[in-house]
Amino acid sequence: MINMKVAISMDVDKISNSFEDCKYFLIVRIDDNEVKSTKVIFNDESGKKSIVKENVNAIICKNISEENYKKFSKKIEIYHAEGDDVDKNISLFIEGELSKISNP
């Protein structure tokens, strides 16, 4: 069973090509393998800090800089998004089908 919070880097209605340049983060709370709630955090000056404040357990993104990887990967698992579809990536995450990013 997955019970955690996940941050997904997004642009409008799809996964962003860049963690650093995304427009916002979608925070998804998953309990018992089901999405229970979502919340949007804009990627402004405090956006990336808000991910930590939200106590997320994982990040889903296409690309992440080495600097941010080092900053976040100590406490948060980082997964590589498959394509642009947000819902599909959430499902893949719940099913354990997304690959962890081990080196940006």
UniProtKB/Swiss-Prot annotation:
Pfam families: Nitro_FeMo-Co (PF02579). InterPro entries: Di-Nase_FeMo-co_biosynth, DiNase_FeMo-co_biosyn_sf, NifX/NifY_domain. Gene3D superfamilies: Dinitrogenase iron-molybdenum cofactor biosynthesis domain. It comes from the Archaea. Disulfide bonds: none annotated. PANTHER family: DINITROGENASE IRON-MOLYBDENUM COFACTOR BIOSYNTHESIS DOMAIN-CONTAINING PROTEIN, IRON-MOLYBDENUM PROTEIN-RELATED-RELATED. This is Uncharacterized protein MJ0327. It comes from Methanocaldococcus jannaschii (strain ATCC 43067 / DSM 2661 / JAL-1 / JCM 10045 / NBRC 100440).
